């Protein structure tokens, strides 16, 4: 082991040079009382003494030295710690081991590099490969993550539209090609292309189903194995497998004129129904979509019935009687278009129960016509019922609105209201209906949870409320509370929103329309307020020292039809009870506004609390006390009823147990009664 000589300047004169060997060994020697390798002699004597002490330490034949001898080596230990420039106790044994390993690895690398430079190059290459493999592994892990389709998203809905097209194609064309031979033979190449494109879409749909997530405990499942297992456990998986069985191979046996071998493709109809259901919930015109959907179903049924009629006519023989399709050798009835249109016409007349068709002749024809009439009756009933309900739903809002108008008309006639006032009322109702303002927002939104209702109100009204000066810097929670309390109001031309001297119980925000600040004569206009303007915010705060009090200071009149948002004083104060800091801030803002306008009496504002405020607080306290009293009375009544029920139960238990106890006591009083129970127990 190499030792280094370090010149140190120490307070001890006898230590000009210090030899630093292995530090841990020296510490152990000093703890055991052995001589340290540090001494006052030169290097030769130091090494000799250390060798002697090593031999003594190994043979365990030395004795521990006393404290006087240990003091002799104290300067050496001090120098040792000064050389390290840190406390050995602060170093963790783990860190020491790590440093030793690093030193060993570096020493080994140096030795190997000197011996074999090729090995060094190999190791460097291996390290580079590992570095390159790490990003590759990360990329592979990212690739393994399955892309899951959200069933409520647009991507899934668009895919449903894509799969619906081949389903509708198969449901309409397979039966037509099977019944009309010319349709299959003349356009065979096109049909094969469409068929196999639809088969590819069917296969892709099976893959999409394995990547379509589902909700489990409110969370979208993205595990690939779970998605596949759920799809396989579903009945639709079996139907999907049956729908893609390659029955087209039977073409090689029967020929190309048998497209009915592809009837298994019709089993994928559930995807079409799913697409229609989702479209009905997404569209803004659900009633129109329902009617068009119903018409489509009826057309498909008529189409299928026409194809079956033509195939029955072909089986019986064209032109054999008056009921079947005429002879195809006739040029007029030999064209493909005439064949299909004639069959479709016959099917429509039969299924709509019009019945202006030639009567059947054969028994099979009679059976087919009877079945058609039964189907037609069901179709007719379905049409009448569905369309009737749709029309009633479409007109429900109008009927309800009209009933309100009729009720008000009857009331005005009963009270002999003037014709001018009646015209104004009717015009106001017409404006509401034409501008679609008859919807009661609270009634529509009452089925939604509070969170969703609040979010809708925030999206609709929050920007409008922030325009008001006093609410500009309020807390978000207070603004949400106030947004939920805004009430829409509509004023017709010439209506006064407020007049000078009226008590201010509401503030108003103009959503749409124009209002005019007019003189007492109602004609002279001072200012015109437009969209986004507001007024009455100071009066509902009821600020102490206001020269106007809580009364209106101007006449405000609607020029045309105006839509306003109204916030009442009671609603504001109810919201501010939960936000006392916001209340003080609003009052301070109101005072500043009044001071700018010169409408604040500072002397009154600096006085103590207003007795009116105290009265309001007292009334509120009385109201809360009344509520507590009613709750206490209700709880007391419940307690009394429960107590009465318990008494009744106890009396029933007493009645039941009393004869049993009497019989037991009578048995004990009789001679030998004590032995009878024991005997009975033993028996």
Curated annotation (Swiss-Prot):
GO molecular function, one term: sodium channel activity
GO CC list: intracellular cyclic nucleotide activated cation channel complex; membrane; photoreceptor outer segment; photoreceptor outer segment membrane; plasma membrane; rod photoreceptor outer segment; terminal bouton
Glycosylation sites: 320
Gene: Cnga1
Subunit structure as annotated in this protein's UniProt entry: Forms heterotetrameric channels composed of CNGA1 and CNGB1 subunits with 3:1 stoichiometry. May also form cyclic nucleotide-activated homotetrameric channels, that are efficiently activated by saturating cGMP, but poorly activated by saturating cAMP compared to the heterotetramer with CNGB1. The channel binds Ca(2+)-bound CALM1 via CaM1 and CaM2 regions of the CNGB1 subunit; this interaction modulates the affinity of the channel for cNMPs in response to intracellular Ca(2+) levels.
Compositional bias (Basic and acidic residues): 105-144
Ranges annotated as spanning the membrane: 161-182, 193-213, 239-257, 263-281, 289-312, 336-370, 371-395
General function of this protein: Pore-forming subunit of the rod cyclic nucleotide-gated channel. Mediates rod photoresponses at dim light converting transient changes in intracellular cGMP levels into electrical signals. In the dark, cGMP levels are high and keep the channel open enabling a steady inward current carried by Na(+) and Ca(2+) ions that leads to membrane depolarization and neurotransmitter release from synaptic terminals.
Species the sequence originates in: Rattus norvegicus
Tissues where this protein is expressed: Rod cells in the retina.
Residue numbers spanned by region Cyclic nucleotide-binding domain: 476-596
SUPFAM superfamilies: cAMP-binding domain-like, Voltage-gated potassium channels
Chain ranges on the Cytoplasmic side, renumbered to this chain: 1-160, 214-238, 282-288, 396-683
Sequence segments annotated as region (Disordered): 34-144
Gene3D superfamilies tied to this protein: 1.10.287.70, 1.20.5.170, Helix hairpin bin, Jelly Rolls
Annotated protein name in UniProt: Cyclic nucleotide-gated channel alpha-1
Binding site for 3',5'-cyclic GMP: 536, 539, 552-553
């Amino acid at each position: 082991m190499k030792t280094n000589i370090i010149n140190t300047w120490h307070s001890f004169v006898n230590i000009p040079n210090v030899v630093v060997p292995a530090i841990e060994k020296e510490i152990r020697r000093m703890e055991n009382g052995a001589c340290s390798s540090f001494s006052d002699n030169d290097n030769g004597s130091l090494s000799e003494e250390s060798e002697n002490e090593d031999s003594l330490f190994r043979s365990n034949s030395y004795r521990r030295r006393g404290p006087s001898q240990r003091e002799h080596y104290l300067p050496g230990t001090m120098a040792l710690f000064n050389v390290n420039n840190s406390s050995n106790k602060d170093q963790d044994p783990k860190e020491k081991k790590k440093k030793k390993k690093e030193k060993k690895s570096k020493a080994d690398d140096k030795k190997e590099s000197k011996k074999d430079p090729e090995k060094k190059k190999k190791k460097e290459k291996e390290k580079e490969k590992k570095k390159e493999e790490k990003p590759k592994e990360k990329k592979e892990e990212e690739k393994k993550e399955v892309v899951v389709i959200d069933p409520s998203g647009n991507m899934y809905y668009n895919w449903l539209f894509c799969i619906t097209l081949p389903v509708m194609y198969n449901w309409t064309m397979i039966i037509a090609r099977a019944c009309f031979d010319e349709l299959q033979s003349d356009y065979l190449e096109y049909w094969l292309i469409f068929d196999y494109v639809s088969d590819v879409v069917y296969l892709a749909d099976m893959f999409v189903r394995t990547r379509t997530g589902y909700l489990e405990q409110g969370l979208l499942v993205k595990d690939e194995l779970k998605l596949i297992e759920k799809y396989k456990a579903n009945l639709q998986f079996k139907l999907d497998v049956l729908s893609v069985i390659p029955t087209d191979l039977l073409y090689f046996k029967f020929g190309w004129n048998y497209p009915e071998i592809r009837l298994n493709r019709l089993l994928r109809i559930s995807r079409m129904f799913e697409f229609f259901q989702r479209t009905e919930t997404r569209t803004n015109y659900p009633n129109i979509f329902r009617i068009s959907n119903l018409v489509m179903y009826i057309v498909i049924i008529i189409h299928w019935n026409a194809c079956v009629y033509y195939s029955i006519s072909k089986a019986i023989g064209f032109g054999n009687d008056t009921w079947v399709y005429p002879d195809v050798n006739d040029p007029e009835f030999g064209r493909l278009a005439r064949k299909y249109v004639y069959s479709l016409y016959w099917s429509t007349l039969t299924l709509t129960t019009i019945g202006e068709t030639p009567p059947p002749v054969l028994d099979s024809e009679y059976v087919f016509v009877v079945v058609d009439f039964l189907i037609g009756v069901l179709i007719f009933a379905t049409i009448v019922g569905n369309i009737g309900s749709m029309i009633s739903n479409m007109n429900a809002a109008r009927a309800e609105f009209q009933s309100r108008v009729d009720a008000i008309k009857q009331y005005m006639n009963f009270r002999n209201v003037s014709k001018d006032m009646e015209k104004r009322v009717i015009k106001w109702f017409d404006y509401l209906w034409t501008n679609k303002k008859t919807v009661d927002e609270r009634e529509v939104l009452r089925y939604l949870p509070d969170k969703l209702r609040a979010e809708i109100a925030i999206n609709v009204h929050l920007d409008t409320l922030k325009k008001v000066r006093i609410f500009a810097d309020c807390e978000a929670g207070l603004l949400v509370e106030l947004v939920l309390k805004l009430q829409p109001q509509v004023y017709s031309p010439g209506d006064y929103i407020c007049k000078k001297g009226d008590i201010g119980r509401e503030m108003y925000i103009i959503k749409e329309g124009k209002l005019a600040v007019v003189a007492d004569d109602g004609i002279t206009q001072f200012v015109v307020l437009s969209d986004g303007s507001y007024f009455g915010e100071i009066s509902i705060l009821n600020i102490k020292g206001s020269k106007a009090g809580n009364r209106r200071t101007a006449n405000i009149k609607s020029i045309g039809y105006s839509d306003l948002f109204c916030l009442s004083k009671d609603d504001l104060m109810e919201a501010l009870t939960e936000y006392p800091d916001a209340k003080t801030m609003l009052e301070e803002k109101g005072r500043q506004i009044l001071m700018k306008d010169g409408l604040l009496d500072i002397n009154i504002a600096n006085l103590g609390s207003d007795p009116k405020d105290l009265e309001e607080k007292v009334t509120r306290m009385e109201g809360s006390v009344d509520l507590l009293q009613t709750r206490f009375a209700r709880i007391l009544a419940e307690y009394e009823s429960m107590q009465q029920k318990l008494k009744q139960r106890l009396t029933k238990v007493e009645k039941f147990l009393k004869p049993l106890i009497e019989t037991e006591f009578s048995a004990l009083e009789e001679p030998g009664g004590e032995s009878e129970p024991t005997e009975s127990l033993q028996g």
